[in-house]
Amino acid sequence: RAEVPREGKTFEEKRFVVFYNHSQEMQFAESLGAILWETAEMPWAFHFDLARHVADEVRHAQMGQARLEQLGHRLADLPMMTQHYAFRRNLDPLERFCLMTLVMEATAFERKRTNVELFEANGDTDSARYESYDIRDEMQHTNLGHVWVPILLRVYHDSRSVTELTDHCRQTIAQVISEYPASAANMIKR
């Protein structure tokens, strides 16, 4: 089985980490799908936007898988990350949606733009195009968080402000990350 580096040192390792992480975005899609199920009280427009978000995350996973295969990696040789399922299942749909849109996706732009620059500097236009496409989707998803989190707060009678909820979600993800072992122990090996 291949070991998956957490951070790459060489260009090839860095590129691998980027697209391996994209290949794991089905977890994001499934967490969003759970939100669809759990938010029957929300208006149709929310479900419409969330369904599009789910489709985008599925596409990102497919993009990552396709790029890894183009680069010569066999998906069957790579472990599947599972650590996000464990902590996101314990969050209510409001916290989960805020965490995913206003924390996780909203804080990824600098890293993703750096990836695009790295790919372009190394003449890898395919990877740069994939990552640029992902950035555009994530911008839309962050905007959905700005639109829907305040409405979710009202619908579910949560007295926190958007800022208070976002800060809580930042603390939650920081705690979870600090508890992850630095090994592949949180992955399913195929």
Regions found by a protein language model. Give the residues of each.
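Non-heme di-metal
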Residues: R1-R190
